[in-house]
Amino acid sequence: MKALFYPTFHQTAARGITQRADPRVGPRHRPAAKRKVVKEMAKKETAPYKIYLTENELPTSWYNLRADMKTKPAPLLHPGTLKPLKFEDMQPIFCDELIKQELDNDTQFIPIPGPVMDFYKMYRPSPLVHAEFLEKLLDTPAKIYYKFEGNNTSGSHKLNSAIAQAYYAKAQGLKGVTTETGAGQWGTALSMACSYFDLDCKVYMVKVSYEQKPFRREVMRTYGANVTPSPSMDTEVGRRINAEHPGTTGSLGCAISEAVEVAVSTPGYRYELGSVLNQVLLHQSVIGLETKAACDKYGIEPDIIIGCAGGGSNLGGLIAPFMGEKLRGEKDYRFIAVEPASCPSFTRGKYVYDFADTGKVCPMAKMYTLGHDFIPSANHAGGLRYHGMSPVLSELYHEGLMEARSYEQTAVFEAAVQFARVEGILPAPESAHAIKGAIDEALKCKETGEEKTIIFGLTGTGYFDLVAYQKYNDGEMSDYIPTDEDLAKGFASIPQVDL
């Protein structure tokens, strides 16, 4: 029976092991020269396939990138007066502590509350993964890493901000919150967070995603959320949008308008947003802080950092500490935002003040926008179907500190399938935009022979997006790129703001 547990000499030799391990041969028994070699090897520890930080290495503060920006994002404007918003102007919509975070351009680090830290430990730190198998498939000299945010029930990075926002709502004594969701990741995350803190949660889900992703809404309902397709007939703005655009599949801008209307008209409720706002990018900085800590721990020096871009929450969080280094003149990186060709806010939008929502009830933001009346085609990357972009990222892009590109969805899904077959994760359609960007950069390295290090954000999993994968696998997926005339209609809705 002993041989079952302790291999004999013949068994170990068969495995290529020609010497038995002697437990007495520890560091004290090694020759000095050998001890030196072992010590040098320890200094150059090779990064594992998956880098997991310990709980003790989890960031204890969020990083506020605005503190290091020489040119701050333009202030939000009151939709009625067109004056910069003050704290009291925002109180009917947002939680008080979140308003403070939204307006704070100076505090570099903001402590993460204890209850939020406790919740983070359920699924954080998340892994930084070396995409070795993708590298081999592409036959590239580039090194590719991805920060995987899909290791929680919500399936994405959205939980990082959802739990923070729910905590502040509970601490303020509120009864519940309202929100919008595109593909459903944010709605799922907020429903989880509200369940944890015993808050009501009303979710307005973009109609096309509500119909495409029935199981995503069931997860939300499982966590106690009330889920309504948007535009609905429950709100004044929803009824108006349905009347003006019969048969519309909706947009994030529509859903935001409905959620805000319900929040401001219901006592004890506030609205919580999953992207775009400064406060959201602040919470999502935990992604970048962990990524940088993992890189520093193993001597990984990225050259290119890539993220998908809809409203900017994942991209802004991933690049935050690296962009901070660039702004302070400490290091240089390339940052690439990847968006859908069907909703090209960065690559074809205008950098102006616009309403953050279709119903014009939200504050106005200076951002890259296609116009608040722009309703994109029914792209399967529902989380990227937003007409605008984060004011923080918009300012950075405007200053030339980051790049942007757009892809058609068939090319994106081709990249998603390539990745899934070698890396073993079915990516969300949104995440697949970043994968496509990373693959293209890696193939450029193959052409030039450069050994660049690429990091991209894998924002979440695509297990609720199987209708989209079915369309792609059956050859029924089509691409749509808005014409100049289509964009002109959206641009026509942009208000004239002279400051």
State where each predicted segment sits.
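Active-site-proximal loop->helix
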Residues: 186-249, 345-355, 468-474
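Active-site nucleophile and cofactor-binding loops and adjacent substrate-binding regions
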Residues: 148-159, 177-186, 277-280, 306-311, ...
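Claisen-condensing/thiolase-fold acyl-transfer catalytic domains that form or cleave C-C bonds
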Residues: 309-317, 409-474
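N-terminal chloroplast transit peptides
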Residues: 1-14
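A short, small-residue-rich loop immediately preceding and capping a beta-strand
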Residues: 161, 169-208, 301-315, 335, ...
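Alpha-helix C-terminal capping segments
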Residues: 164-174, 188-200, 221-222, 319-329, ...
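Positively charged, low-complexity intrinsically disordered leader regions
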Residues: 44-174
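Active-site/ligand-binding loops adjacent to catalytic centers
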Residues: 109-111, 241-279, 287, 299, ...
